[in-house]
């Protein structure tokens, strides 16, 4: 990691944020691939290979890697990979993104949204820095990564949207998953029919979940959801929880099963940067 790849210090934890790719730091990418595979495999996903590195990490117009580095431990804590979507469009107007393997984009999405969008993917925090494993070191891990996303907004002032997938794993409680997905579709719908999964996950009867949140405002409905999943010995996935409480205008799309990554279930989401709640902006983005 060299000075030219340094982006900023984190607000908490005295860590550092870097942006790199296959060409600027190939050896660091190998370590990212190793840590990503360990991280995702521990949760029931992963590629099954030694390294989680794919075509999108290494091709000519590869994704950038945003990482958090601990100078004290000399370890990578976690990160995202991202790509400015406008840079992924070919001469025929087609977009070459990792999400296009699983989701079909409408013409409206390609014309109205993608030219001003960054795609985020492969969000990860390595096991040694996860709160459930190491509460002290894991306290600010996700917070630090979001400091990095704040830097992206400064780097790319024309960007209006963050688009990506939020992952749930096959061993996640099925009824909790179904309620969570119903909740997302209820409060954060894709009213413009922008994106559809090629092979959408089918959930069961949702009438019981509808009865629990019918007529309730978001905060009260969220309490119902949170109580429901906790009663079943689980919790709302941390990244999902962050996105749900980021803005009122988030859009939720279909959930696709990813057979190339341990059959994880990936829900498409779109966040409008201008609509992020002020307290979140002050914390990470300004």
Model regions and ranges:
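N-terminal regions that are enriched for targeting/export leaders
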Residues: 1-8
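Short amphipathic alpha-helix that is part of the acyltransferase structural core
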Residues: 9-55, 64-78
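Short, flexible loop/turn elements at secondary-structure junctions
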Residues: 21-24, 70-72, 81-87, 122-127, ...
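Acyl-donor binding region in acyl/amide transferases
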Residues: 37, 47, 87-249
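A short helix-loop-beta-strand connector motif used in the catalytic cores of GNAT acetyltransferases and
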Residues: 57-67, 250-251, 261-267
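Carboxylate/His-rich catalytic cores and anion/metal-binding grooves
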Residues: 63, 68-97
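Extended effector regions of multi-domain proteins
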Residues: 231-234, 264-268, 274-278
């Amino acid at each position: 990691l060299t000075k030219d790849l340094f982006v900023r210090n984190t607000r908490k934890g005295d860590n550092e944020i870097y942006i790199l790719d296959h060409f600027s730091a190939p050896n660091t990418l190998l370590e990212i691939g190793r840590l990503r595979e360990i991280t995702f495999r521990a949760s029931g996903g992963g590629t099954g290979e030694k390294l989680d590195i794919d075509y999108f990490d290494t091709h000519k117009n590869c994704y950038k890697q945003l990482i958090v580095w601990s100078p004290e431990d000399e370890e990578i804590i976690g990160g995202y990979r991202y790509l400015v979507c406008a840079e992924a469009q070919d001469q025929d107007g087609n977009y070459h993104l990792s999400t296009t393997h699983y989701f079909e984009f409408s013409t409206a999405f390609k014309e109205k949204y993608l030219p001003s969008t960054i795609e985020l993917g492969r969000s990860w925090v390595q096991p040694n820095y996860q709160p459930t494993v190491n509460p002290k070191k894991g306290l600010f891990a996700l917070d630090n990564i979001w400091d990095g996303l704040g830097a992206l907004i400064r780097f790319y002032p024309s960007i209006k949207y963050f688009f990506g997938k939020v992952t749930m794993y096959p061993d996640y409680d099925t009824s909790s998953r179904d309620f969570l997905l119903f909740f997302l579709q209820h409060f954060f719908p894709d009213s413009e029919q922008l994106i559809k999964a090629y092979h959408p996950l089918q959930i069961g009867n949702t009438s019981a979940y509808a009865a629990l949140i019918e007529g309730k405002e978001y905060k009260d409905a969220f309490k119902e959801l949170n109580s429901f999943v906790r009663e079943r010995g689980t919790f709302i996935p941390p990244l999902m929880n962050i996105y749900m409480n980021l803005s009122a205008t988030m859009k939720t799309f279909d959930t696709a099963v990813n057979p190339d990554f341990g059959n994880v279930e990936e829900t498409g989401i779109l966040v409008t940067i201008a609509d992020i709640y002020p307290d979140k902006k002050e914390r990470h983005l300004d």
